[in-house]
């Protein structure tokens, strides 16, 4: 058995095909081109742009990606049918991912054919695709449950007929790492890819095991998107190879987080907060012991530097926070409390945490201002707010605010009243800089139709990030309150930074 990786390892990204099969996800041709361009910039080798046989829109997407001049190979999914192959070639694809069911379950139940019929279909399709001038990756669907001698026969003859690459598809996530180590080596008739699903949580580990066993390419999706529990995650695999095995993947790792958030925004599938590498909590620390350790030496509680994947470390404060973490956070905010003031601030933060409150940056500032008796004049004050929305009306918001003493009125439309309100606020402060809404969440604190809602937002400006919240019975006003609190924090920090620079 091969025990070292066969380098360089290639990455075949199927976010635009298998990832788009995530329930509820549907990308436009323009959105697909955006993601494909970002993938190519990050350094993936092959982009599966979709299935040319699926729709006119899919063919438009494939054509646009093929014509974009990207460094990555443009591939399309095809069945073992001449019509599928013609559509792929006519759309301008460089290669085809020729998928053929190889388990008896799929052959008999899905296709209602015999092994002999399926294998001949596969080989004939390989020959036809080569006649059309395409690179061919012959893929065994449900290979984990296939008779391995039959799979080897399909692959061996497929290569004889012209297949350039092979792919072992663990279609429902049943392949284990130890089994992958045993069954991959006998299938290396040509460069072999591994395609894993994460139904039982083994996708990443099995992909690594297959690569160690001689596979040279991994099929992945951004954020682990895919049917059911998803596919092996690009960002997790890249960093596992780099950090744990010292492999130079050739991927621009500092772009992994921007790519992840880009895909999350376009697909509408939010990132799990505790997702490795790209989740909100991946580089966030609250516990006093952990936070203190990280502040002294980040490697005490982090496996890699967050900057390596385009992230920043966050120390958040709550009931588990110790004095050192609170003092460091206050220092970053421009506060220098005395020992007695620090103790009081820590006690108040812990009381809020014990009450079940999520503590935002704006909360901490308010506590510090109160304890240290600092008079704070907000940079932004709301004077008037109007929202128009209805079944036949485009949601429109207008807002009048005092921004650093100047009265400014702004208006905007949105997909809904909350969206319109936030856009109006952003437009009103445009003269003092672009404030971006990175995250928005809402919870009902009480029950009933008059429920008190708690809106939390994360805003950023010029590389700085802040969290804030608002609580009202009116979700729109709670959102406005949260955004204004965050904007005030950002503008206040900016003012203090400039004051320090002038000193």
UniProtKB/Swiss-Prot annotation:
Q: Which reaction does it catalyse?
A: pyruvate + acetyl-CoA + H2O = (3R)-citramalate + CoA + H(+)
Q: Where does the UniProt annotation place the signal sequence?
A: none
Keyword field contains Transferase = yes
Against SUPFAM superfamilies, the record matches this protein to: 2-isopropylmalate synthase LeuA, allosteric (dimerisation) domain (SSF110921), Aldolase (SSF51569)
EC number(s) recorded for this UniProt protein: 2.3.3.21
Q: PROSITE patterns this protein is in?
A: AIPM_HOMOCIT_SYNTH_1, AIPM_HOMOCIT_SYNTH_2, PYR_CT
Q: Which NCBIfam families match?
A: LEU1_arch (TIGR02090), PRK00915.1-2 (NF002085)
What protein name applies here?
Putative (R)-citramalate synthase CimA
Gene source species = Methanoculleus marisnigri (strain ATCC 35101 / DSM 1498 / JR1)
Identify the coding gene. cimA
